[in-house]
């Protein structure tokens, strides 16, 4: 189902949601951190989704073990490097990794700015080693409030040339986008792109707000757009992309089953929507699974899957020249 003549991308992928269970085990031992299990086999049910979670917040608790073992900046550097290694192993040509340095720093009170620097270093070294092209998206974790998001923003701005875009993630219902207008004004002043998690836990009004008030060029998940025909028309007309994450939306109980997922309808409506993983380490999936198992189960035809693959590159936060070069590089292989 993957067209090997086209670039394969993953533009909604959380770096801090893709920490290998084996790495959690090893870092736990290295830093004497108490884990819920002492073997890989018994640890996996604690750090990966085995059955669908009742809601998004329950799903997010699975991520916590991954960041609890980040006891040093070297550990942060390691997981960033391994994210690129994983991307290469799964055949990705281009990946946008998003991360919340405040979340990664929290368990061991690491310096937030230091986490940003460590992630940049690890990703840079991974790209050199494995030949994958990557860009970084800074996440503000709204769940921790405006002040914590401000701290994350300042850390990103200290490395503004290595950050491509700003995102807002976390508790969408408890912390609406309206609380973060000034943060996104500064992001646009820095020349960054904007993508926002919206329409996952909250309704279509959250997506409208992300676009109109925060300046979103892309929407993370965006499943609730299906409830608003005018919004779907607007997304198609303005070419505002939806970063679809099929398996994730089932595991968080955002969508009941793959057959009911709105991605097929979005594509039929002319919306620029792509296929992505979200938190592959926690979900126990990879991009190949999303294309070859999840997308057909969601009712997508072979041509629709190919269109979603094309959309992934078109939506990417790359210049027209960078996109052309990537297309030519893949076609030449």
From Swiss-Prot:
Activity regulation (UniProt): Inhibited by reagents such as p-chloromercuribenzoate, and by coformycin, a structural analog of inosine.
Cofactor(s), names only, from the UniProt record: Zn(2+)
Protein name: Adenosine deaminase
GO biological process, one term: hypoxanthine biosynthetic process
Gene Ontology terms, MF aspect: 2'-deoxyadenosine deaminase activity; adenosine deaminase activity; zinc ion binding
Catalytic residues in the record: 200
Keyword Zinc appears in the UniProt entry: yes
Enzyme Commission (EC) number: 3.5.4.4
Site positions (Important for catalytic activity): 221
pH dependence: Optimum pH is between 6.9 and 8.5 for both adenosine and 2-deoxyadenosine.
Keyword Amino-acid biosynthesis: no
Entry's Gene Ontology cellular component terms: cytosol
Organism this protein belongs to: Escherichia coli (strain K12)
PANTHER family, A to Z: ADENOSINE DEAMINASE
Catalytic class of the enzyme: hydrolase
Binding annotation for Zn(2+): 12, 14, 197, 278
Record-stated family: Belongs to the metallo-dependent hydrolases superfamily. Adenosine and AMP deaminases family. Adenosine deaminase subfamily.
Covalent S-S links between cysteines: none
Binding site for substrate: 14, 16, 170, 279
């Amino acid at each position: 189902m993957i067209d090997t003549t086209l670039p394969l991308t993953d533009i909604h992928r959380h770096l801090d949601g893709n920490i290998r269970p084996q790495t959690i085990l090893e870092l736990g031992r290295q830093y004497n951190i108490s884990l819920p299990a002492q073997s890989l086999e018994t640890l996996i049910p604690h750090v990966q989704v085995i059955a669908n979670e009742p809601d998004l917040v329950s799903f997010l608790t699975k991520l916590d073990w991954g960041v609890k073992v980040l006891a040093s900046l070297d550990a942060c550097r390691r997981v960033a490097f391994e994210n690129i290694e994983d991307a290469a192993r799964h055949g990705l040509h281009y990946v946008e990794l998003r991360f919340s340095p405040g979340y990664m720093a929290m368990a061991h009170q690491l310096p937030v700015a230091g986490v940003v620097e460590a992630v940049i270093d690890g990703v840079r070294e991974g790209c050199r080693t494995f030949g994958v092209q990557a860009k970084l998206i800074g996440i503000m974790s709204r769940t921790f409030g405006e002040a914590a998001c401000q701290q994350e923003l300042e850390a990103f701005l200290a490395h503004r040339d290595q950050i491509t875009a700003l995102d807002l993630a976390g508790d969408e219902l408890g912390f609406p986008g309206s609380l973060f207008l000034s943060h996104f004004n500064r992001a646009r002043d820095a020349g960054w792109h904007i993508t926002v998690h919206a329409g996952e836990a909250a309704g279509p009004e959250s997506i409208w707000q992300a676009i109109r008030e925060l300046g979103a060029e892309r929407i993370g998940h965006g499943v609730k757009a299906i409830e608003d025909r005018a919004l779907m028309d607007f997304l198609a007309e303005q070419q505002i992309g939806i970063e679809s994450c099929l398996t994730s939306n089932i595991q968080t109980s955002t969508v009941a089953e793959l057959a009911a997922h709105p991605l097929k309808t979005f594509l039929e409506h002319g919306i620029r929507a792509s296929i992505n993983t979200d938190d592959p380490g926690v979900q126990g999936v990879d991009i190949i699974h999303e294309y070859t198992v999840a997308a057909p189960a969601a009712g997508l035809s072979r041509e629709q899957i190919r269109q979603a693959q094309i959309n992934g590159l078109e939506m990417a936060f790359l210049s027209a020249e960078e996109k052309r070069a990537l297309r030519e590089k893949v076609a030449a292989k």
